[in-house]
Amino acid sequence: MKTKGKAWQLVLTVLLIAAFVYTAFFGVAVKYGDVTTTYIKGAKDIRFGVDIKGGVNVTFVPSDGYDATDDQLEAAQLVIENRLVALNVTDYELYVDNNSDSLILEFPWQSGETEFDPEAAIEEIGTTAYLTFREGSSADGELVLDGSMVESAAAQYGPVNGSSSEYYVALKFTDEGAKAFGDATTRLYQTGGTISIWLDDENVSTASVNAAITDGSAIITSSASSPFTQEDVVKMARQINSGSLPFALTVDSYSTIRPSLGENSLSAMVLAGVIAFALIMVLMTALYRLPGFLACIALAGQVAATLAFVSGYFPVFESFTLTLPGIAGIILAIGMGVDANVITAERIKEELRSGKSLDGALKSGFARGLTPIIDGNVTIVIVAIVLMGAFGPSDGFFAKALHFVFFAFGPSTAGTIYAFGYTLLTGVLLNFVFGIFATRTMIRGAASIKALRDPRLYGADAPGKTPAEKKQVNFVGLRKRFLTFSACLMAAIVLCAVVLGVHLDTEFTGGAMITLSYENSFEMSAVQKTASEALGSNGLTLQTGENVATGEQTLKISMPGTETVTTDEVQTLLDSLNESCPDNSFAQLSLSNVSAAMGTKFLQKSLVAVVFALVLILAYIAYRFKKIGGLTGGMMAVLALLNDLMVVFGTFVLLRAPLDGNFIAAMLTILGYSINDTVVVYDRIRENRGLLGKKASFEELVNHSVNQSARRTIITTVTTVMALGVMCIVSKLYGLDSIFTFAFPLMMGMLSGVYTSLCVSTSAWVAWSERKNAKKN
């Protein structure tokens, strides 16, 4: 029976994907004179996170342990939003954590901004700005009115009371405020009293009442000894107009990054993505010929669709802030996106080499490849959902769904991890659309064209050529060696951790991280001493690095525990370093502060996320493979996963890299990816059990299934490792340590995943079954 595909299906699908790729990357906009109207958003409209664009991430908490109500937190959120808008900062993300009474704010720096002063922005945004007019000159004088009775405030410059011109703030009261101010000034004028104006605890002005003021207006002037500047009155007017906070705020943690540093990072990650895609395209075409080439077309559509979901291409989906780990998720999805195509292509090749016709091979290959594709990708979806639920905004869908798991920790809102989970989830779900539907439509269409019906184009051997007999590896027979090796490997990793030590990042322990750029070389001991004296800390850790692409050298200074630093203290550090080392030209790149309590919560939440993901994966495997002993198989798969997780952990230890959010993201990704490989093997075992029944022993069944799955598992891992390898190389060249310490351990974990999926999980399952049967006998 001839395939149901039509040639027009191939042509139409290719054209649709090409059009979609073009519009997703470049968008659709029309320019009339100086006005540009955007109809479809493209890659240029993507909102980039602070790690790319530069900006601030800060967490505010009530001062002095104040227990804020939910209504007060919402009121504080509104005030901060008003202040951000007044600062012309509209591309921000602000979340309220009702569990820990905190407000988490992230915003990129303004385009074209040259003076990057995040400390000033944080101070202005977090200032209580409680405006009061009081009788007398004391802060506890009788209240006349407060900021809620001010209708508007405006920064002005001009003569005041007939004197020389100066900067001042002009106030216009509400009706209630006008009456209160009129009554007070009428009374105080008769007694020769004074009125003082206070902003929080600061006395900004005190004046004698020389007349009754009943016109509903007033001005705030400065003292002769400390005149207002233009910046002072503009800032004060903004704060008054945006309203006062219902309680005082303290900065619990914050981090900043220089815009130019992020721009270099973006260039590096885009380059890594292009190279990874090109390498995978060459590999897929070489291995699978026509299906491999068509798979690459579908993969291009998948990448474009991922960008479309991020940029706001689809009006029904809001644009999403893209971070560097988010881009890493897209690149990883490129590698993993070929999985469905590899499974299908391998199945088609098997059917052709078994003697089936092209149409029969396509039909059988598509049918038999669907189940393992679905089962394998579900595990990745589980991991992505856990990432988004644990580290996303509290009002997000997955955060609400998983609130029962993480409620005790509050929404940590680790935007970088959340972005990674989002792009990973989007990529995997789109893999079903493009890797299954689009690829199969194109293959069916190609198979209906006479010139493309040669079975050799789909992986068949040349006519008359006898397929080389595949050598069966006795994986199960070597189980004792495999299990012994895994045990020794994990023991060695534990020993390395004890000897070398495990370093926790300030993200987990709390503290500060300062990143500086410098020129030429220096004596580490001299810089260590100068930095310790400037910052007043003896617990500093210094680490140097280099951006090979830009030639910029970097110095990271870590302060542990409860120690944090301000921008003024960083400036003191820079002055001291440049004074003692004038040839090095030290300059600030970024600053990060995390409270010890917040770091501990983040670590605890991360560990719970890993355990919860393991439980979900075990439950899924137990359910899907219950006919062949799914619970036992699931436990053995989880046991094998420990090997992979230990490899990731060991890589961090050997690199002397601190455990941070990247470590947790890598661990969770390995959970989903490695179990994906194992699930594909288990699916073969289930299929072969149905075909062979009791004709084969469990050991023979497992060994046969592992041999059938080995090629697919290795090839899929090779494509993903290629993508990660490119990320490692490019991140090293550009000095992106955060990306390298994510990609390299992940790559090692995936290589371990091939080994454990083929050699450990199934071997442990057989060993367990033998022991169980021996007890019965």
Where are these regions (language model features)?
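A structural signal for conserved, well-ordered secondary-structure elements
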Residues: 1-777
